[in-house]
């Protein structure tokens, strides 16, 4: 008789809790996000920034066709990590909800309303049979009265952040944000910080495999940065990265000298 792991029964159905209170399928959906490309968001006094790593696996792929930051409305954007097809379904739903709100109330939808709608859908996919949890997390950013930034989890939970990262480089990026984030940052400083965090999680950062978008307080309009703009910011960031690496090496050598 084949050995059956004790958690097997709870693995097969998303609606059944394990004895220790876990939903295994939700945990597996989170694992899909953890294996995904890194996406970061940074809020500042002038607006909000989203930046993502584009994992282009072949030189034959057109980089412009590989989209990881999506416009939801004029004033709302989303960045994804995890299963891209799942993220696309969530993005399309967010776009629909934003347009329904405009038609119903004659005003732009508050970001918090759209986030709640998306997370309600995610939560439903953890509770009913015949479906599975979405294997994607979204960072949702926007400007209504002020800049806002949310992280949405596969479980349906959501949190507001000043700076946040999802995907495989989350831990590294979050450590950088903890160290370098300031509430009074300008938009340019926020862009640099977002690209800096991404660059530290990537082997070969370049303008081709980084995508950046901003929404400013001034015009409340979504805009993607051009390749030339990203190259400019990345050049400045890489100088900072190199300077930090030199300082770290100097500290390592000074510690070594102290042992003699």
UniProtKB/Swiss-Prot annotation:
Keyword Cytoplasm (UniProt): yes
MF annotations from Gene Ontology: threonine-type endopeptidase activity
Keywords: Cytoplasm, Proteasome
Signal peptide span: none
Cross-referenced SMART domains: Proteasome_A_N
Subcellular location: Cytoplasm
PROSITE patterns: PROTEASOME_ALPHA_1, PROTEASOME_ALPHA_2
Gene3D superfamilies the record matches: Glutamine Phosphoribosylpyrophosphate, subunit 1, domain 1
General function of this protein: Component of the proteasome core, a large protease complex with broad specificity involved in protein degradation.
Family: Belongs to the peptidase T1A family.
PANTHER family per UniProt: PROTEASOME SUBUNIT ALPHA/BETA
The protein's name: Proteasome subunit alpha
Name of the gene this protein is made from: psmA
